[in-house]
């Protein structure tokens, strides 16, 4: 398995399985002198961890992160940062009945075909449990971006099943278990999830992430465009089946006069492009959305085959998220942070001396609301 490292200058390598002893990460390329503590990382880990509400998996993991190296007297040293989170609430017996079966729409079948062996306990390495280390590493990246460039990254749930939520109030996002920015939609989401739990079914979701106070010039055309790398990062999250930058697929129905982001000396008049032109950041908010499929670990029987190719009926009795998108917001934020920091360091290395002489256009016209 060779796909466990992300980034070029700011790199993150993760290891560990869902029911193994621990999860870990090695971060390399972190600038020195940044104040960093375990508490800084724990804030985002607590936002992601399981068992925090009745609408997520009831697996109880403290997700207490330990910084093993790379930090001295409260500051990064520039050497590799080692991170570790112990698994404490594995219940592998839940998976005994399906160890020789392939759960529909899971990685069971493909892992077995590729490697000839798989850890069936909770999905092993393919489990979303692995994303705890992405969130921890992303918290480091967030801290560096805020300190060196003033960039802030945050996200929200923009759709749960058929229920759409507009970005009305950032302050509401952390006040409910859904990361929903529209307070009026929360009761509807609660009722929907309660009905879903009774049914034993699951549903998908859409998450939107935004990087504010962006700087222009990040992105390496032609193959390492910042939007291409961002799409790569977000598609690498478990259960993600689609990514949009800015207007995304809605641009198909737009006319050129609607989609073009006109520029004035006072600022950009809109942000249909999502803060990227030609694969390079414009300095506007960098905006991406991702679609997450419904989990197929269900109490409702489903058809599949066993390792010998015989037909079987699969029922999954483990502890699973009825909507994996509910806990995906901090994961998406983390992946966006990793991409932006990697590109910021690459840009500083090659183009840090460049002075274009072109005035920096504000991200939007002062007082303008909307896209």
Swiss-Prot record:
PROSITE patterns: CHORISMATE_SYNTHASE_1, CHORISMATE_SYNTHASE_2, CHORISMATE_SYNTHASE_3. Reduced FMN (FMNH(2)). It catalyses: 5-O-(1-carboxyvinyl)-3-phosphoshikimate = chorismate + phosphate. This reaction introduces a second double bond into the aromatic ring system. The gene is aroC. Its EC number is 4.2.3.5. Pathway: Metabolic intermediate biosynthesis; chorismate biosynthesis; chorismate from D-erythrose 4-phosphate and phosphoenolpyruvate: step 7/7. Gene3D superfamilies: Chorismate synthase AroC (3.60.150.10). GO terms for cellular component: cytosol. This is Chorismate synthase. It is an enzyme of class 4 (lyase). Homotetramer. FMN binds at residues 125-127, 238-239, 278, 293-297, 319. Keywords: Amino-acid biosynthesis, Aromatic amino acid biosynthesis, FAD, Flavoprotein, FMN, Lyase, NADP. It holds the Pfam family Chorismate_synt. It comes from the Bacteria. Belongs to the chorismate synthase family. NADP(+) binds at residues 48, 54. Coiled coil: none annotated. Its cofactor is FMNH2. PANTHER family: CHORISMATE SYNTHASE. GO terms for molecular function: chorismate synthase activity; FMN binding. Signal peptide: none annotated. GO terms for biological process: amino acid biosynthetic process; aromatic amino acid family biosynthetic process; chorismate biosynthetic process.
């Amino acid at each position: 398995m060779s796909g466990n490292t992300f980034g070029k200058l700011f790199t993150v390598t993760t290891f560990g399985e869902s029911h193994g002893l621990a999860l870990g990460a090695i971060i390399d390329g972190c600038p020195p002198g940044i104040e960093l503590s375990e508490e800084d990382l724990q804030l985002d880990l607590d936002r992601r961890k399981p068992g925090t509400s009745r609408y997520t998996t009831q697996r109880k993991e403290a997700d207490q992160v330990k910084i093993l190296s790379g930090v001295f007297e409260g500051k990064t040293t520039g050497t590799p940062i080692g991170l570790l989170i112990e698994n404490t609430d594995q219940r592998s017996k839940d998976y005994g009945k399906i160890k020789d079966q392939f759960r529909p729409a899971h990685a069971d079948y493909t892992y077995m075909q590729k490697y000839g062996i798989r850890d069936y306990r909770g999905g092993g390495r393919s489990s979303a449990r692995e994303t705890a280390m992405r969130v921890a590493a992303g918290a480091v990246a967030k801290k560096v971006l805020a300190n060196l460039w003033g960039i802030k990254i945050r996200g929200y749930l923009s759709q749960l099943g058929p229920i759409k939520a507009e970005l009305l109030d950032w302050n509401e996002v952390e006040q409910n278990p859904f990361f929903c920015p529209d307070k009026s939609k929360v009761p509807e989401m609660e009722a929907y999830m309660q009905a879903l739990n009774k049914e034993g079914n699951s549903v998908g979701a859409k998450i939107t992430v935004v990087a504010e106070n962006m700087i222009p010039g990040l992105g390496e055309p032609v193959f390492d465009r910042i939007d291409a790398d961002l799409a790569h990062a977000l598609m690498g999250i478990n259960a993600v089946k689609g990514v949009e930058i800015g207007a995304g697929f809605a641009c198909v129905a737009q006319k050129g006069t609607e989609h073009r982001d006109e520029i004035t000396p006072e600022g950009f008049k809109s942000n249909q492009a999502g803060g990227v032109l030609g694969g390079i950041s414009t300095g506007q908010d960098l905006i991406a959305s991702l679609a997450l499929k419904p989990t197929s670990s269900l109490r409702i029987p489903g058809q599949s085959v066993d390792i010998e190719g015989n037909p079987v009926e699969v029922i999954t009795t483990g502890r699973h998220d009825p909507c994996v998108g509910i806990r995906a917001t901090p994961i998406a934020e983390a992946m966006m942070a990793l991409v932006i920091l990697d590109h910021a360091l690459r840009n500083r290395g090659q183009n840090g001396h460049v002075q274009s002489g072109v005035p920096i256009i504000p991200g939007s016209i002062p007082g303008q609301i909307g896209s």
